[in-house]
């Protein structure tokens, strides 16, 4: 009979569901319980014919574990319109519990193959056949035999079923035994599986559906979520029952109907009746079903009788349960349904009747025929139900479930979910440093809120345990509501101080506005939009006295007055905020727990509460015996071992009996090295047992009893047990390993785990970590209360004697911040969306349950295909592959670890000569599962494949490798640990042996069913999840257009859930079956390879590839100069445009970006779609789709997943793309970012000189700093270990100074904040740092910090990242000439003789050969690596670097290598020995100051790009080709065009006379004209654009289209620019042409010679000098002539023009003529003979001077001329004095200056200064022996006297200092002379 529903009286809202534990179930057992009878009547197949359970369970136990729904009467109210104000009952609707009976936990046991043949119904080989198993008694007996001898409890019956297994589902259904589990003590799937493995040969060793909860199965069957509405069948009237502490109702599951929008009238579908008849008939006709003639006859007769009445069956509303019941009953009849033993007699009788109807006599009817009929009826029933499920999902729901229904269902779920009650809490304890006193909970603050319906808290309560030092009377004055609330409000309101001040300061500096109200308008607009602060309506009005702020501080104070609150803390004393004081801790905890239980919570939130707050509260409850809780005692087993890990807490968060199940942190993956170690140990142990049997007793005497049995942590634990007995348990130490706690009724959500690792606010200079303080500032702009009274060390004092108000406020603010972060991250709404899609309650989403969650998603698809859920407890003994005695077996392939996706090796390098395009497969792994139908369900067993046609499946050959370990010791060697002539003791056998391994290729042919046979579960899941995601993203966009913010948030959470769920499918397949996982990755690799093959043909070889992506270079569109290119094609963009647009001078950026994009889009289309008209098929099956992801125009590829690039965006913008760098990982520091990001930017942009200088400066500063830090930490550690706890700060500071520490780099820049794991057994650097901190400050390990400050050494911070980049530069082999030069420099730097260098060369050559040989061996990488034919050639395609740069990089590597080795040796001696020599930079104070300023500036302010600049930013020469040509300089203002323009102000400045210094720019709207002009002076109201920075920083970008600044004028002092670094002021236009910016672009290397610069060929100069004077001429005069293309050289005989090229400050060529009028008559006199000496006599340049340039640079202010001569050697300086002109002539063979050509220079500098005669110059040879290394830029200058003085100086005294380690003395040499090594 159909269910009649009363929508008003029977509507219930449910928010959670669970299966209670047996104690909770036992509480609801009642003698008069009448539900048992109903269950008994409907489950007769579970009980024997006598009415008693054949497994021994009583009838009451039959139904004592119901599903428990938490419900409330009626529906939830609509979401509030005002989210900032709560109205209603804080506890929400009255709740009770609905006990739903009739469903049981079930497992499926798969029968062996001999039971699957229906033709063997008479077979009794195993005492049973498949017909026998239709009988309850036979099934029960067989299961009992399988469970014999095992402690298996709680199974109450069985049932024979016909279902598909999870693996090889496409092979068809199998007979299984369904085992029903119930009772107080139930068997786990793990126990059953172990039992089957040990005892049974009738069942496969699998337990299906073990991870599917009963309520998940129920919800999936009903298509209902874990949150929603339900109704109870009218007339049932269960009635609300009163329990001791809660109300409840009892119902049967069949009496419940969900509001799931899954009830339809099937007749609305055209032809549905005929479809159903055909569906039922097709089951009989399927050739794989193989039904007998009797079954076919009977079913066809039933279908004929069904046809006339089917219209009535489908004409009324049906949900699936009703529909299935009607169809099965009409087709099968009641007697045949389920084929239970009760009906077997009638079934047999009916079979015989049918045979008679077919004309077969009774005596001819064989028993085998009848049995086969009975078994086939069972098969048909299950196949019918499966077909009806598929029909319902695909035909009915797919057509009748509308978008309106879907939206209503989603909105209903979110309406309920957003109103669920959540409570956040935080505790304080009475911790005292260096004290063993028992810690107590002193304060608890609770904030009640909901999951998104309101922005504000609902209610707050503070529970305070009064200290004994205070009286209850004194609390009236010591603790007041108003003061606490005011302190909380003040902290929240003042939290934005830092952000406000930073923004205001920058805005004021740029605008100069204090007296304008516009700055406040700008400020309030920004803060309201970015931070959603509430502001008074009159915020923009000034005070009554009309006084305006006149400074940043006044402006800040004014703004703060206008801010109401950042968020509403909603603390109204007596209304929604209450403080409760208690005399005892126990009273306080009881009140707190009562409040929690009364609040009807769904979620309990906290910050690190799972690992601290909750365990601490539970520990105190156990100590105080609250609620009968007892202290935990570790279980001791019969073998003497102890259970060290606690499994559950007896804490109730509701009024029902409950437990908190502990989920510990999972261990990481086991490395191959561990497998190898385990296997070899096992192998050696077995050998020892055989070889040393007689020596066991002797060996045992020598062994320690714990050796080899326990790891270090277990040994420590065992030692504690010996000392203190078996009850030793350290609850808070164990709590640190807890991942989460899971209750049956309330979820525990740790907000700290919800916070992403990469927090926002990249400009914040305070270290980022996941502490509450950092996270709150990152997401809210607010910090914790920072006051001395509430510091960690003083909290207890404040609680006892101090200001209680700030004590309470401190805890309250922490709780409020946690709540607000939780709301900001939308974690509650995400949980509601996730729970609804995975059919699990919210509480199960935080229990480290990714496996269960994904299996639940898959089960929702497996259910309607009649497939069981898989057994996830897969054990793969990978150790055995590494055993030296292992022999390969083909069946072992399934246990090999699948190989990963596509990788690429040997392509590291700098790719500046080509742009590259990164293609990416869209959701490749889900796409492979869909397109190739790869899934565990479609993977066919051999038996199933043999039954199919070859057209029904595809074969896939999957490659892999397995290891072959072999003994590597020389046979008979005395060093061999297996040489019995040497080894005499058992324990020594094999210990010192060497082992090596090789890999052997293997493959496996897997067969996957095609979609025509069955669509894979994984593919169907992914397809639907991705389709839903696309749908939700569309709805989100529509909601955004309509301004519905609530729907935007909801749909965003839903689409994120779909994405996460789809991505998790592959991980589950990889776990369940290695063959399936390997097939997916193999096909993905092949797709990548096929795409790369084509892209290589049309574009070029691959520079990158990673899993689902590949990146070819544009080999046919090189960016560097090629033979045949026009000489005017200067710069990569000019060349690229010339190749793309032949004949055009300068196309727009958008044009050639569009052309490149179109070109490569066509390549992708060819692969994705093929060319149908030409018969060219696509390269893969849809939905596989290769798309352009990124286009790079500069790339540095360091290694896999580790690169830096400049990315071209579709609109013509340029952005930075960074992947995998160390500066982005958890141990990131500012220094790492300054090392990698800055240097990689320099490489990509071609600033090679800056790279060398900056890298040298940075490393020199950091190696000194970090060495001193490490030495000081070592000294403190020794002191602490020896019991010295006083004076440690002074010791640390003194040690740092002794080791050269100079406060050059702020500590915050090289300190990381890292997670602390195991402090008692420290493994990571963070663990060790925190352990030392705890010992130093007397902090108990149990309450150690979760994150700590870590200062790592020079290698991880700078050395390793820098070396990796350096090696990338050197990846390309040098030319023969470069090899010769580099070899000579190596000899000089390393002080090697020719013979020593030859040996070193041979060593390196041998090393390369070994690497080459090793690479030729078989290895796992061979499976995944991109074929060599598709890779770039590093020696052809990487950027070649000039000799000068290569030498600089090699010298830097030598410097790093020396430093790291020296510091390592010092570290090994605890820094008693001093072996490290300070870098040369430390000896030159002027250079040190310069380097420090520049490096600190780079660390503080460097940004790769603060916004997306136009692409031509990458190449200024592209701008220069489109300079605004100014012909009439008399006009004051000049208008810029509104197009893609980029104005280089230097190039405008060079066209003027030299004296005008200023360029002015007028700010205007983009729609108007932008103007600029040149002036001799500036007005007071103008704002100076001043830049002394090296690279573009955020402060350098000024907008020129700000409507609030219209009419303002910026100006630049160009003479100031002239003295700065290689800077270029530019005005750039954004790609969308809507904005203009004034920016500054520069380099790191300083060069003051900006104005007067030219280059002359050496040979040209030699000829000119010989023609312009006598040999005896003392001077030659060089004059640039205005408007001419050369330099006039004047001698005594004649004068003439010498052809030259004028250059800019950065080495780039200027227009051919000299531009500076006023410098026309100023000549520079150069001593002729000295110049000739430089050109002819220098050994280093004698052979190259005729082929290279001299470069002359003039400094207009100091009138200095520098002549640079190219050479390839390091720096030497020679000084001498010219008496006639009183000039100092300085000849530098070194690094003074830059050039495009690259290489070392010889520089001559003439300075017009009078100085004393310098001392005698040190001869060249002797000077070179002063050090092994000479600096790249400014080496110290040593005279002969300097050396003598150095030789005669007595040795510096070694200072003995007390290290703090018990008076032990160590030597530290003070004041090492700087500059003696680098």
UniProtKB/Swiss-Prot annotation:
BP GO annotations: base-excision repair, gap-filling; DNA replication proofreading; nucleotide-excision repair, DNA gap filling; viral DNA genome replication
Enzyme Commission number: 2.7.7.7
Record field: compositional bias (Basic and acidic residues): 710-723
Biased composition (Low complexity): 1868-1878
Region (Disordered): 691-727, 1839-1878
Key word NADP present: no
MF-aspect GO terms: 3'-5'-DNA exonuclease activity; DNA binding; DNA-directed DNA polymerase activity; nucleotide binding
Domain of life the protein comes from: Viruses
UniProt biased composition (Acidic residues): 694-709
InterPro entries, A to Z: DNA-dir_DNA_pol_B (IPR006172), DNA-dir_DNA_pol_B_exonuc (IPR006133), DNA-dir_DNA_pol_B_multi_dom (IPR006134), DNA/RNA_pol_sf (IPR043502), DNA_pol_palm_dom_sf (IPR023211), DNA_pol_type-B (IPR050240), RNaseH-like_sf (IPR012337), RNaseH_sf (IPR036397)
Gene3D superfamilies documented for this protein: Helix hairpin bin, Palm domain of DNA polymerase, Ribonuclease H-like superfamily/Ribonuclease H
Catalytic activity: DNA(n) + a 2'-deoxyribonucleoside 5'-triphosphate = DNA(n+1) + diphosphate
Family: Belongs to the DNA polymerase type-B family.
Protein name per its UniProtKB record: DNA polymerase
């Amino acid at each position: 009979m159909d269910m009649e529903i009363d929508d008003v009286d029977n509507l219930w809202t449910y928010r959670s569901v669970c299966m209670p534990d047996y104690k909770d179930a036992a509480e609801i057992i009642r003698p008069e319980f009448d539900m048992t009878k109903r269950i008994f009547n409907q489950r007769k197949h579970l009980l024997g014919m006598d009415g008693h359970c054949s497994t021994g369970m009583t009838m009451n136990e039959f139904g004592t574990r119901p599903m428990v729904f938490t419900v409330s009467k009626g529906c939830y109210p609509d979401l509030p319109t005002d989210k900032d104000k709560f109205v209603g009952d804080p506890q929400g609707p009255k709740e009770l519990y609905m006990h739903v009976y009739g469903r049981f936990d079930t497992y499926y046991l798969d029968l062996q193959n001999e039971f699957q043949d229906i033709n063997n119904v008479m077979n009794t080989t195993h005492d049973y056949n498949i017909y026998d198993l239709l009988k309850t008694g036979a099934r029960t007996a067989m299961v009992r035999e399988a469970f014999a001898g095992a402690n298996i409890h709680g199974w109450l019956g069985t049932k024979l079923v016909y279902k598909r297994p999870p693996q090889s589902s496409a092979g068809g259904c199998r007979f299984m035994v369904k085992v029903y589990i119930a009772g107080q003590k139930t068997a786990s799937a793990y126990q059953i599986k172990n039992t089957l493995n040990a005892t049974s040969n009738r069942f496969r060793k699998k337990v299906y559906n073990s991870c599917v909860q009963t309520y998940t199965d129920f919800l999936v069957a009903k298509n209902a979520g874990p949150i929603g509405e339900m109704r109870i069948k009218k007339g049932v009237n269960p009635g609300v029952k009163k329990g001791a502490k809660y109300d409840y109702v009892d119902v049967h599951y069949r009496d419940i109907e969900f509001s799931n929008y899954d009830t339809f009238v099937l007749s609305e579908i055209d032809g549905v009746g005929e479809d159903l008849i055909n569906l039922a008939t097709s089951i009989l006709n399927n050739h794989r079903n193989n039904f007998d003639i009797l079954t076919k006859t009977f079913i066809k007769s039933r279908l004929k009788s069904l046809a006339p009445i089917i219209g009535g069956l489908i004409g009324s509303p049906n949900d699936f349960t009703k529909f299935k019941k009607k169809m099965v009953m009409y087709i099968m009849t009641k007697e045949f349904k389920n084929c239970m033993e009760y009906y077997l007699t009638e079934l047999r009788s009916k079979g015989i009747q049918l045979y008679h109807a077919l004309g077969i006599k009774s005596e001819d009817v064989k028993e085998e025929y009848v049995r086969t009929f009975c078994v086939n009826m069972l098969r048909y029933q299950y196949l019918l139900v499966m077909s009806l499920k598929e029909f319902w999902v695909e035909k009915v729901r797919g057509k009748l479930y509308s978008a309106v229904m879907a939206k209503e269902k989603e909105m209903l779920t979110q309406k309920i979910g957003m109103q669920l009650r959540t409570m956040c809490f935080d505790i304080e304890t009475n911790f005292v440093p260096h004290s063993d006193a028992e810690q107590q909970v002193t304060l608890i603050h609770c904030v009640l809120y909901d999951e998104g319906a309101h922005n504000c808290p609902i209610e707050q309560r503070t529970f305070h345990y009064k200290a004994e030092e205070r009286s209850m009377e004194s609390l009236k004055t010591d603790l007041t509501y108003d003061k606490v609330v005011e302190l909380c409000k003040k902290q929240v309101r003042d939290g934005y101080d830092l952000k406000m001040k930073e923004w205001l300061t920058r805005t004021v500096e740029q605008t100069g506005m204090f007296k304008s109200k516009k700055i406040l308008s700008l400020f309030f607009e920004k803060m309201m939009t970015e931070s959603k602060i509430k502001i008074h309506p009159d915020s923009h009005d000034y005070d009554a006295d009309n006084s305006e702020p006149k400074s940043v501080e006044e402006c800040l104070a004014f703004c703060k007055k206008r801010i109401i609150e950042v968020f509403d803390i909603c603390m109204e004393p007596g209304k929604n905020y209450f403080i409760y004081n208690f005399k005892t801790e126990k009273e306080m905890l009881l009140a707190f727990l009562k409040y929690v239980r009364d609040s009807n919570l769904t979620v309990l939130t906290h910050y690190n509460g799972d690992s601290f707050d909750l365990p601490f509260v539970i520990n105190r409850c156990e100590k105080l015996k609250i609620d009968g809780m007892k202290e935990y005692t570790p279980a001791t087993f019969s073998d003497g071992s102890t259970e060290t890990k606690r499994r559950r807490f007896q804490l109730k968060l509701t009024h029902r009996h409950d437990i908190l199940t502990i989920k510990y942190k999972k261990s990481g993956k086991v490395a191959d090295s561990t497998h190898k170690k385990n296997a070899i140990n096992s192998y050696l142990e077995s050998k020892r047992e055989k070889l040393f049997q007689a020596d066991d007793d002797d060996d045992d005497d020598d062994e320690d009893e714990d050796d080899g049995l326990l790891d270090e942590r277990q040994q420590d634990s065992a030692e504690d047990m010996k000392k203190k007995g078996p009850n030793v348990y350290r609850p808070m130490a164990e709590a640190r390993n807890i991942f989460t706690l899971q209750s049956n009724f309330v979820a525990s959500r740790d907000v700290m785990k919800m916070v992403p690792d990469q927090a926002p606010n990249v400009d914040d200079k305070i270290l980022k970590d996941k502490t509450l303080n950092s996270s709150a500032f990152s997401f809210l702009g607010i910090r914790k209360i920072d006051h001395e009274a509430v510091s960690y060390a003083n909290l207890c004092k404040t609680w006892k004697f101090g200001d209680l108000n700030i004590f309470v406020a401190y805890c309250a603010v922490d709780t409020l911040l946690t709540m607000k972060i939780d709301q900001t991250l939308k974690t509650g709404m995400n949980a509601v969306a996730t729970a609804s899609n995975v059919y699990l309650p919210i509480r199960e989403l935080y229990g480290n349950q990714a496996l269960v969650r994904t299996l639940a998603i898959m089960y929702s698809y497996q259910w309607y295909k009649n497939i069981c859920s898989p057994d996830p407890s897969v054990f793969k003994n990978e150790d055995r592959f590494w055993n030296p005695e292992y022999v390969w077996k083909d069946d072992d392939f399934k246990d090999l670890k699948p190989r990963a996706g596509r990788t690429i090796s040997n392509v590291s390098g700098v790719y500046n000569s080509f742009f590259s395009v990164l293609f990416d497969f869209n959701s490749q792994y889900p796409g492979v599962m869909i397109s190739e139908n790869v899934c565990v369900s479609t993977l066919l067993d051999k038996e199933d494949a043999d039954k199919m046609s070859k057209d029904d499946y595809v074969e896939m050959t999957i490659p892999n490798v397995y290891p072959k370990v072999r003994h590597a010791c020389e046979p008979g060697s005395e060093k061999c640990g297996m040489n019995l002539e040497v080894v005499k003791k058992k324990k020594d056998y094999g210990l010192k042996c060497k082992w090596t391994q090789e890999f052997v290729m293997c493959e496996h042919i897997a067969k996957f069913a095609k979609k025509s046979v069955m669509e894979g579960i994984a593919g169907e899941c992914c397809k639907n999840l991705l389709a839903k995601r696309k749908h939700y993203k569309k709805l989100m966009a529509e909601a955004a257009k309509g301004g519905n913010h609530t729907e935007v948030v909801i749909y965003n959470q839903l689409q994120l859930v779909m994405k996460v769920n789809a991505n998790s499918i592959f991980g589950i397949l990889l776990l369940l079956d290695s063959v399936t996982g390997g097939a997916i990755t193999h096909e993905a690799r092949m797709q990548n390879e096929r795409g790369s093959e084509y892209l290589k043909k049309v574009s070029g070889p691959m520079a990158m590839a990673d899993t689902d992506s590949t990146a070819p270079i544009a080999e046919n569109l090189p960016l560097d100069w090629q033979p045949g290119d026009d000489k005017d094609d200067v710069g990569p963009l000019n060349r690229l445009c010339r190749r793309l647009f032949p004949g055009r001078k300068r196309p727009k950026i958008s044009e050639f970006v569009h052309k490149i994009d179109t070109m490569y889009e066509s390549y992708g289309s060819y692969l994705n779609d093929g060319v149908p008209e030409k018969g060219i098929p696509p390269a893969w099956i849809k939905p596989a789709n290769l798309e352009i992801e990124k286009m790079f125009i500069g790339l540095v590829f360091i290694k896999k997943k580790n690169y830096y690039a400049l990315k071209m965006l579709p609109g013509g913008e340029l952005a930075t793309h960074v992947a995998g760098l160390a500066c982005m990982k958890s141990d990131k520091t500012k220094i790492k970012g300054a090392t990698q990001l800055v240097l990689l930017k320099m490489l990509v942009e071609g600033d090679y000189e800056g790279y060398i200088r900056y890298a040298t400066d940075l490393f020199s500063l950091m190696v000194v700093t970090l060495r001193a830090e490490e030495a000081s930490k070592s000294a403190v550690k020794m002191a602490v270990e020896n019991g010295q706890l006083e004076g440690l700060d002074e010791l640390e500071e003194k040690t740092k100074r002794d080791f050269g520490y100079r406060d050059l780099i702020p500590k915050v820049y090289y300190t990381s904040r890292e997670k602390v794991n195991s402090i008692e057994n420290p493994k990571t650097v963070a663990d060790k740092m925190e352990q030392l901190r705890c010992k130093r400050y007397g902090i108990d390990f149990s309450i150690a910090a979760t994150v700590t400050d870590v200062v790592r050494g020079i290698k991880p911070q700078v050395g390793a990242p820098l070396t990796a980049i350096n090696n990338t530069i050197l990846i390309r082999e040098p030319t023969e000439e470069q090899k010769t030069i580099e070899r000579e420099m190596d000899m000089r730097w390393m002080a090697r003789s020719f013979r020593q260098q030859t040996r070193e060369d041979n060593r390196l050559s041998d090393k390369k050969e070994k690497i080459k040989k090793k690479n030729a061996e078989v290895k796992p990488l061979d499976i995944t690596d991109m074929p060599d034919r598709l890779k770039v050639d590093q020696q052809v395609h990487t950027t070649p670097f000039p000799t000068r740069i290569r030498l600089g990089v090699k010298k830097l590597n030598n410097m790093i290598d020396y430093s790291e080795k020296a510091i390592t040796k010092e570290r090994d001696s605890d820094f008693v020995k001093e072996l490290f020599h300070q870098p040369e930079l430390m000896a030159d104070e002027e250079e040190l100051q310069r380097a420090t300023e520049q490096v600190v500036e780079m660390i503080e302010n460097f940004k790769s790009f603060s916004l997306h600049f136009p692409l031509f930013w990458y190449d200024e020469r592209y701008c220069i080709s489109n300079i605004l040509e100014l012909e009439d300089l008399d006009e004051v203002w000049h208008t810029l065009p509104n197009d893609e323009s980029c104005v280089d102000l230097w190039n405008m400045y060079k066209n003027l006379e030299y004296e005008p210094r200023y360029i002015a720019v007028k700010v205007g709207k983009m729609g108007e004209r932008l103007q600029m002009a040149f002036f001799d002076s500036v007005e007071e109201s103008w704002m100076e654009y001043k830049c002394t920075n090296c690279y573009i920083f955020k402060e350098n970008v000024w907008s020129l289209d700000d409507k609030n600044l219209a009419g303002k004028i910026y100006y630049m002092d160009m003479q100031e620019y002239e003295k700065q670094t290689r800077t270029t002021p530019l005005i750039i236009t954004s790609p969308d042409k809507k904005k203009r910016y004034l920016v500054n672009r520069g380099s790191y290397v300083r060069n003051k010679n900006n104005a007067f610069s030219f280059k002359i060929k050496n040979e040209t100069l030699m000829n000119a000098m010989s023609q312009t004077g006598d040999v005896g001429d003392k001077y030659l005069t060089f004059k640039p002539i205005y408007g001419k293309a050369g330099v006039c050289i004047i001698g005594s005989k004649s004068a003439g023009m010498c052809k030259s090229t004028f250059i800019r400050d950065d080495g780039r060529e200027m227009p051919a003529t000299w531009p500076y009028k006023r410098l026309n008559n100023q000549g520079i006199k150069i001593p002729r003979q000295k110049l000739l000496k430089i050109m002819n006599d220098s050994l280093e340049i004698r052979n190259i001077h005729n082929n290279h340039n001299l470069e002359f640079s003039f400094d207009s202010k100091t009138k200095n001329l520098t002549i640079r001569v190219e050479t390839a050697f390091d720096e030497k300086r020679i000084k001498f004095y010219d008496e006639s002109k009183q000039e100092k002539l300085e000849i530098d063979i070194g690094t003074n200056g830059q050039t495009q050509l690259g290489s070392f220079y010889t520089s001559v500098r003439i300075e017009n200064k009078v100085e004393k005669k310098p001392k005698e110059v040190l001869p060249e040879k002797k000077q070179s022996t002063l050090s092994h290394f000479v600096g790249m830029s400014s080496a110290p200058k040593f005279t002969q006297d300097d050396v003598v003085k150095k030789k005669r100086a007595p040795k510096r005294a070694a200072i003995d200092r007390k290290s703090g380690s018990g008076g032990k003395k160590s030597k530290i040499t003070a004041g090492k002379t700087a500059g003696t090594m680098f």
